Design a protein with these regions (language model features):
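Extended alpha-helical surfaces
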Residues: 1-242
Length: 242
């Protein structure tokens, strides 16, 4: 299903653009499984600076490339991340599936919570206005107006309650590993709840999501090893792909 494949397209766009900026080949970093062939995207960008991709992905790639030329790799990542999640949300809305729309909201909430905690730990709250994503259960404005130590209260009514409490502690120097694990577990819990539905779309879509996540993990591990990445970098990519 395309919704579960979008993230591969944006991963590959990031790899292609950053490799070009560094003057190296992205081969070994590209992942299969996206809506568009990764090798074709690489060749098109290298030869003509264009991509066979969705309109949203092409627009985001052009903006990201411009930011990389201005030596703003963080800005490039943020533009592509925002476009990726926006495409996922739009596609979920088109399906009219409450399960899929809730799944994407869960992913956006987890991404925003991670962003808020990392910004607090690094003392870089100025990045929040352009880093936080629209479309979650908690608004970017609400997150920006909340002190890091009170993130648990802001997300307390949802699936990220435990993660938010650990995030509040991590923002002040607590364990980042426990916080990241809790974010992953919250998404797993959302899928697990759907598995208990005996019939209906949830059962099928939950199965697809679980299989896609397993395939994603295998691809990232194998690609990372082939590229000589450290175990820590591979673990980071696994978290970001969830």
């Amino acid at each position: 299903m395309d919704l579960f494949r979008i993230k591969f397209d944006y991963h590959n766009i990031k790899a292609i653009l950053k490799a070009e900026r560094r003057g190296i080949s992205p081969e070994g970093l590209l992942l299969s499984g996206g809506r568009y062939d990764a090798e074709r995207m690489q060749n098109e960008w290298h030869q003509e600076h264009r991509l066979t991709a969705s309109d949203a992905a092409r627009d985001a790639a052009e903006k990201a490339a411009a930011l990389l030329r201005e030596n703003d790799p963080q800005g490039a990542d943020l533009v592509l991340d925002a476009a990726c999640y926006a495409e996922m949300a739009a596609l979920a809305a088109e399906t009219k599936s409450g399960f899929l729309q809730g799944y994407v909201r869960q992913l956006i909430d987890a991404a925003n919570l991670r962003t808020a905690v990392r910004a607090a730990r690094s003392g870089s709250s100025e990045v929040l206005p352009r880093a936080l994503l629209e479309g979650g259960s908690v608004s970017p404005h609400g997150i920006m107006m909340t002190e890091p130590g009170k993130l648990g209260e802001l997300f307390g009514a949802g699936a990220l309650e435990k993660a938010a409490a650990l995030g509040a502690a991590a923002a002040g120097g607590g364990s980042l590993t426990a916080f990241e694990k809790a974010c992953d577990e919250a998404t797993d819990a959302y899928l697990a709840a759907a598995r208990r539905t005996p019939f209906g779309e949830e059962t099928v879509l939950c199965y697809l999501a679980a299989v896609e996540n397993e395939i994603t993990a295998i691809r990232i591990i194998m690609t990372g090893r082939q590229a000589g990445l450290s175990p820590e970098m591979i673990r980071s990519r696994l978290r970001n792909a969830g």
